A protein has these predicted regions:
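Short, surface-exposed ligand- or partner-binding patches at beta-edge/loop junctions that are enriched
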Residues: 82-83
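Rhodanese-like catalytic fold shared by cysteine-dependent sulfurtransferases
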Residues: 2-29, 33-38, 46-79, 88-121
Length: 121
């Protein structure tokens, strides 16, 4: 077996999966959803949330989504814009929420990016 080729293929596949999970919504699409009433969900810890947040965002930590979100968001068709500190946890949240039957979930990415999008900058 040619190990360098095999390892290269694995790296490409893993990279594709990670990119797919972390792909962020465009600024234009996010702003369109915000104007139409999308909810912004911050999946960071409560401590992180208290240190700075997007105006109007709801804090539901990643580990609490499965239990908390259905109680707080009854309409599964509600557009949800998720973010965290860097975009990694929000990528996981997006996948988890889609698996829970929420089809309209978009990853804003990092806190800084989410703040800029919401502020219109």
């Amino acid at each position: 077996m040619n190990w360098p080729v095999t390892i290269g293929i694995v790296v490409v596949i893993v990279g594709f999966v990670v990119f797919k999970r972390l792909s962020f919504v465009s600024v234009e699409v996010a702003r369109k959803h915000l104007a139409a009433g999308a909810l912004v969900i911050d999946v960071r810890s409560p401590e992180e949330f208290r240190s700075g947040q997007v105006p109007g965002a709801i804090n539901i930590p990643l580990g609490d989504l499965r239990d908390s979100l259905p109680r707080r968001v009854k309409d599964k068709n509600q557009v949800l814009l998720v973010h965290c500190l860097s975009g990694g946890r929000s990528g996981m949240a997006k996948q988890q929420l889609k698996g829970m039957g929420y089809p309209n979930v978009f990853n804003l990415g990092s806190l800084g990016r989410a703040q800029q999008i919401v502020a219109g900058k």
